[in-house]
């Protein structure tokens, strides 16, 4: 009888030992200050630096901490989520390096009972559709692209360029749905303004930075020495700036190039401050600061108050050029 009682008592103690850590973790997590992560695919780019800094600034103001992590590939994304889980983080904002990582990211977040929202690039499921139940904040990619194409068309008219004498360098990344929507939107606007379809030349890029833009643009420009005037567009301003550097290497005058990017960040500001104008005419500026702040605010309110963020929030942009960049920067708070 006593042996049976001791056996049952031992089992109860073992069960309690197994359960206690889980309960203690839950209590610690409930009492500890809120911690979230902010994961970005290219932590060295000014756009993402601004987003993460805006998240941290909001955290200081509203009493939560932000763990800033660079995640340039899928393996690092999953490792970052594990890292956040071990720190007791309750959620994260993410701009993933590959939108097709959606199901894997969702599964890993579920393992740690973490909420997450996406910013800039919307995650997709195995069928290519937006990942369900994951709030997103980004740009209206097609409309932003339309703005790029319209800005180029307006500047062509201002300079008196004839469509038949102009080539368009379309730097493409069709692996990233957002990139395709942006360049397709720009193409739509150009064609609607009378640009010749046969004068649009594709330049596939491998990376979405300056180097990727340069590497994509240089061989295409070199293959068409008969084209004397060029317009350039892509998914972001870094890529366009890389392409502009390629035109300079081939001694194409800056006055014969109209490059328009998307974002409105540090590299564009530096370009506008150069002593002489370059082929980088402008960029459709969107507030990276607001993207970082608003996506973080959405996540924190979801965690703290149970307020589910909107499923899909789309922001708009404004043309920023050498003439108005300081005013636009102040207006957008970037």
From Swiss-Prot:
GO MF annotation list: carbohydrate binding
SUPFAM superfamilies listed in its UniProt record: Periplasmic binding protein-like I (SSF53822)
Keyword Transport: yes
Subcellular locations according to the entry: Periplasm
Residues making up the signal peptide according to the UniProt record: 1-30
Principal subcellular localisation of the protein: periplasm
GO biological process: L-arabinose transmembrane transport
Protein keywords: Periplasm, Signal, Sugar transport, Transport
Domain of life: Bacteria
Gene Ontology CC terms: outer membrane-bounded periplasmic space
InterPro entries registered for this protein in UniProt: AraF (IPR026266), Bact_Solute-Bind_Prot2 (IPR050555), Peripla_BP/Lac1_sug-bd_dom (IPR001761), Peripla_BP_I (IPR028082)
Subunit architecture: The complex is composed of two ATP-binding proteins (AraG), two transmembrane proteins (AraH) and a solute-binding protein (AraF).
Family: Belongs to the bacterial solute-binding protein 2 family.
Summary of the function given for this chain in its UniProt record: Part of the ABC transporter complex AraFGH involved in L-arabinose import. Binds with high affinity to L-arabinose.
Matching PANTHER family: D-XYLOSE-BINDING PERIPLASMIC PROTEIN, L-ARABINOSE-BINDING PERIPLASMIC PROTEIN
Record protein name field: ABC transporter L-arabinose-binding periplasmic protein
Originating species: Azospirillum brasilense
């Amino acid at each position: 009888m006593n042996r049976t009682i001791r056996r049952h008592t031992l089992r109860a103690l073992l069960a309690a030992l197994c359960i206690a850590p889980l309960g203690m973790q839950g209590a610690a997590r409930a009492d500890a200050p809120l911690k979230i992560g902010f994961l970005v695919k290219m932590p060295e780019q000014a756009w993402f630096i601004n987003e993460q800094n805006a998240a941290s600034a909001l955290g200081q103001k509203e009493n939560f901490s932000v763990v800033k992590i660079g995640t340039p590939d899928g393996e690092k994304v999953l490792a970052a989520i594990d890292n956040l889980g071990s720190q007791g983080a309750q959620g994260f904002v993410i701009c993933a390096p590959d939108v097709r990582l959606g199901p894997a990211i969702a599964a890993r977040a579920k393992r740690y009972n973490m909420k997450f929202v996406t910013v800039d690039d919307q995650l997709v499921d195995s069928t290519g559709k937006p990942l369900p139940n994951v709030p997103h904040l980004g740009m209206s990619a097609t409309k932003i692209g339309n703005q790029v194409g319209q800005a180029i068309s307006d500047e062509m008219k201002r300079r008196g360029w004839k469509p038949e004498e102009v080539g368009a360098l379309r730097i493409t990344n069709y692996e990233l749905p957002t990139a395709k929507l942006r360049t397709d939107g720009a193409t739509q606007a150009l064609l609607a303004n009378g640009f010749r379809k046969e004068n649009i030349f594709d330049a596939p890029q491998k990376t979405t930075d300056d180097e990727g833009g340069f590497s994509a643009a240089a061989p295409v420009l070199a293959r068409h020495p008969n084209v004397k005037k060029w317009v350039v567009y892509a998914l972001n301003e870094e890529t366009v700036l890389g392409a502009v550097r390629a035109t300079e290497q081939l001694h194409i005058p800056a006055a014969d190039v109209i490059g328009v990017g998307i974002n409105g960040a540090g590299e564009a500001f530096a370009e506008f401050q150069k002593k002489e104008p370059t082929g980088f005419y402008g960029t459709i500026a969107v507030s990276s600061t607001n993207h970082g702040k608003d996506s973080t605010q959405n996540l924190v309110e979801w965690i703290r108050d149970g307020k589910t963020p909107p499923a899909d929030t789309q922001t708009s942009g404004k043309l920023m050029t050498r003439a108005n960049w300081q005013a636009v920067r102040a207006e957008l708070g970037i």
